[in-house]
Regions:
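Cytochrome P450
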Residues: 5-422
Length: 422
């Protein structure tokens, strides 16, 4: 088995059971459900699990229900189960705000990750500032570097033997390296960065705030370095940038840098892991993509539909009558991509993964004004990763004496994926 030299060690997943808050008095008892993304069947770390498929159970119920414990800190949320209704929420920032201070709350603070947790009009200003950095044209300019890094890692795996842990040896080193390259940094601290992200997104109540403080210190130190000696990288761009004819404040630079850090590390690696896990279990689909690699782009979209990793939560800014449901100001509203993407009203036979599916209106990258800023880069990383893997690794399968461990929660993922091609 590949020793994974240079690859970050994967830690055992810690999934705390959220402590549920009481159900608000305005929630009718018949609208309270027992499903949540943390402790329902398939959500806890599960060998050979499929947490996205497990979410489909909600489609047997009402279009909206109240889950008393559906956030990492045990907050209750309304759960929107229909893709069409999720789109209504996600494109209505006037009624449903994005400002939650997810990261800052780990420190007992309240400041936004930018632009993710901003509402109009401020959101539009920062989005316009940042869009060119992750435009299709800019992503194409990174294509050579993305492909070279992917090929390097896979060739190293192939040279080491006929088995590897994809998450440790490929998915995370690949995604983190591209993130570091975008920041203008070397990958000398790759293992450190993965550890921070793991503690922040999946750690306990001690690890999370410690990781948050470490990430903030890193972002602040990098900003100070670039102020003193700017180079051609993302942080230097933020230092030079102007909004409303003024430079960005320290808090705005921090909020933007933190978002890039959090968003750039875990989700792409998880997507690659879920994709290769699927192909390892479905040799006919694996063979199809080997015979016709031109299908990989379309297949990647179907795999994004089937295996998204995040839920978007909005906060009601006012009392809303949502098709007769009494959403009150301050209520949390969950729009989970893994629920919308298994909606039978939106997709024909949604539990079946069809790599030839066309007109794929999935919401893996969210929807509306907050559609993922880095979606173009993420897509290229996933497609290139699959192309190079299938080109360089013979037909593969899950190693017989192992079981990939999947999990739901704040960000869905796969802890380990040991493949074999002997």
């Amino acid at each position: 088995m590949n020793s994974g030299k240079g690859g970050p060690p994967r830690r055992a997943m810690i999934m705390e059971t959220p402590v549920a808050h009481s159900v608000p008095p305005h929630v009718p008892p018949h609208m309270v459900g027992d499903f949540n993304l943390f402790t329902s069947p398939g959500m806890m770390p599960t060998p050979n699990g499929d947490p996205q498929a497990a979410c489909a159970v909600v489609h047997d119920g009402p279009p909206i229900f109240y889950s008393p414990s559906n956030t990492r800190d045990g907050r209750g949320t309304w759960v929107i189960t229909r893709a069409q209704d999720q789109r209504r929420v996600l494109q209505d920032p006037e009624s449903f705000s994005s400002h939650r201070s997810i990261f800052a709350s780990a420190l007992g603070e309240s400041w936004p990750m930018i632009p993710l947790e901003l509402d109009p009009p401020e959101h539009g200003k920062f989005r316009s500032l940042l869009n060119p950095l992750l435009s299709p044209k800019r992503v194409m300019a990174l294509e050579t570097a993305v492909r070279e890094r992917s090929a390097f890692l896979i060739d190293r795996i192939a040279a080491a033997g006929t088995s590897c842990d994809v998450m440790k040896d490929f998915a995370f080193p690949f995604a983190v390296n591209i993130f570091l390259r975008f920041l203008g940094l070397s990958d000398d601290r790759l293992e450190e960065f993965v550890g921070w992200a793991n503690d922040l997104l999946h750690g306990d109540n001690v690890q999370r705030p410690a990781a948050a403080r470490t990430i903030i210190a890193f972002v602040d130190d990098l900003a100070a370095e670039r102020r003193a000696q700017p180079v051609d990288d993302f942080m230097s761009f933020l230092i030079r940038a102007r909004i409303d004819d003024r430079p960005l404040t320290d808090a705005e630079i921090r909020g933007t840098g933190v978002l890039l850090f959090v968003a750039g590390l875990d989700t792409v690696a998880a997507a690659i892991g879920f994709d290769l896990n699927y192909l390892a279990r479905h040799p006919d689909d694996q063979a199809l993509l080997r015979r016709e690699p031109s299908r990989i782009v379309l297949a990647a979209e179907e795999l994004l539909r089937a295996y998204p990793t995040v839920q978007m939560i909005r906060v009601a800014t006012k009392d809303v009558d949502f098709d007769g449901v009494p959403i009150r100001k301050g209520d949390y509203v969950s729009c989970a991509t893994m629920i919308a993407n298994r909606d039978p009203a939106e997709f024909s036979d949604p539990q079946r993964i069809d790599l030839t599916r066309e007109d794929n209106r999935h919401t893996a990258f969210a929807y509306g004004p907050h559609r993922c800023l880095g979606s173009h880069l993420a897509r290229r990383e996933i497609v290139v990763g699959l192309e190079e893997w299938l080109k360089r690794i013979p037909p593969f399968r899950i190693r017989e004496d192992t079981a990939p461990v999947t999990y739901g929660g704040h960000v869905f993922g796969i802890e380990n994926l040991i493949l074999d091609w002997s």
